[in-house]
Swiss-Prot record:
It comes from Frankia casuarinae (strain DSM 45818 / CECT 9043 / HFP020203 / CcI3). This is Urease subunit gamma. Pathway: Nitrogen metabolism; urea degradation; CO(2) and NH(3) from urea (urease route): step 1/1. PANTHER family: UREASE (PTHR33569:SF1). Belongs to the urease gamma subunit family.
Amino acid sequence: MLLSPHEQERLLIHVAAGLARERRARGLRLNHPEATAIITSFLLEGARDGRGVADLMSAGRTVLTRDDVMEGVPEMLGEVQVEATFPDGTKLVTVHRPIP
């Protein structure tokens, strides 16, 4: 299977998010990269499903809570940005303070 660098990056995000979800299901608190992967994967899949940018920007703040992550992660994660592919093209989705 030949993947472009862009496709490899997206696949890596989804694999990392899957691992992070497994750790979360075992009761482990997530670190910065794991939290970022879960939120980014959520945004990419939401775009693929046809959700709007504004909807994803709002919903992206509900994916994880402070109880899901290690101490200090919400403060380190000031925003998550991803270029997501929507039915009408690629758009930048930015979620400010994704872990309120």
